[in-house]
Structures are given as C-alpha cells and as structure tokens.
C-alpha cells in the first residue's frame, strides 16, 4: 500500500493507467459479479450499479468535498479489506497531519470499492474514500472514455464504517 503522503495529491479526475491485472470478484462475463464480501468494522456492504459521484455539501457555510482520496491495488485479487485499511490509514494520517484551526480533519467513514477495466480488461481494485456515507442514488459513475479507450466501473460496492469518526480532535483537560 502506498503511503498517505504519496496519495494526498490525487484528485478525483486523475486518469491512471496500469498494466497489472487483478481478477477481482468478477465472474466470466463482463459486468457479472458476485455479491460484495463483508469487511470487519464496516456495516453490510451495498452492491452498486456504478461508482459514487458525491456532490459538495455545505459545512460551516462553505462548500465541502466529502471525497477524501483514492487507492488502486493492481497486484492483488479483489479484496475490499485493502480499501478498509486504506480508509483507516487515511483517517490516521489526516488526524495526525491535516487538522485545521478548528481542530477538524477529514475522516474516512465510507468507501466504495470496484474493479476498473480498460477495454474490458481488469486493471485493479479501485477504492474511493469519503468522509460520509452516500446512498446508491449517487452511484452514477459508470466510467469514461480516454481517447479510443473505454474505462469502465464494474463490481462496485459501498462500505460504511460501523463506528464513524467525528473528524474532530478532542482535548483532554487535566485537573
């Protein structure tokens, strides 16, 4: 897994090209998937028709992006527990290094996991991290074209942390 420092600069519009192939949890045909496996510490997963496209929300009178980065694992079979570990690692990194003046940071409380394909060939397990849960009505990102190549989202699922982090540093007062 890459370090959080190496991935902080990734934005949702980045286009990644990888050559290693993962088998994921897809079956023989394109888009045929088994149900998403459970992950310790997360609620029962929701199988999705596409990846989440989360809007900005209002927080403290400002637009706030709940998206909190991504990870791509392309040397392992599909395993959403890798995404869970990445989510937890991102929260820890943000808590230690990215606390604002109000004592707030962006916790990872939700992730989507899916297989990204290029022209039907699996590239790897993609993990998109978020500060809050989004329901399946936001699962509208089915992929994109880049030149002549078609990148598709298959076997998507979402996972919400069973004990969400508030994203606030609490100070202990010693008396």
How would you describe each model-predicted region?
Residues 131-170:
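Extracellular juxtamembrane "stalk/stem" segments on the ectodomain side of transmembrane proteins
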């Amino acid at each position: 897994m890459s370090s959080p420092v190496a991935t902080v600069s990734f934005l949702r519009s980045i286009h990644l090209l990888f050559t290693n192939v993962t088998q994921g949890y897809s079956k023989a045909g394109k888009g045929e998937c088994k149900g998403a496996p459970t992950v310790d510490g997360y609620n029962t997963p929701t199988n999705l028709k596409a990846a989440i496209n989360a809007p900005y929300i209002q927080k403290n009178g400002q637009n706030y992006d709940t998206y909190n980065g991504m990870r791509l694992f392309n040397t392992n079979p599909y395993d959403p527990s890798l995404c869970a570990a990445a989510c937890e690692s991102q929260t820890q990194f943000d808590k230690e290094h990215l606390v604002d003046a109000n004592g707030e940071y962006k916790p990872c409380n939700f992730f989507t996991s899916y297989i990204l394909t290029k022209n039907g060939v699996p590239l790897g397990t993609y993990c998109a991290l978020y500060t809050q849960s989004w329901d399946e009505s936001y699962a509208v990102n089915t992929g994109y074209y880049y030149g002549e190549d078609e990148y598709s989202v298959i076997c998507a699922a979402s996972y919400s942390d069973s004990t969400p982090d508030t994203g606030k540093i609490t100070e202990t007062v010693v008396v």
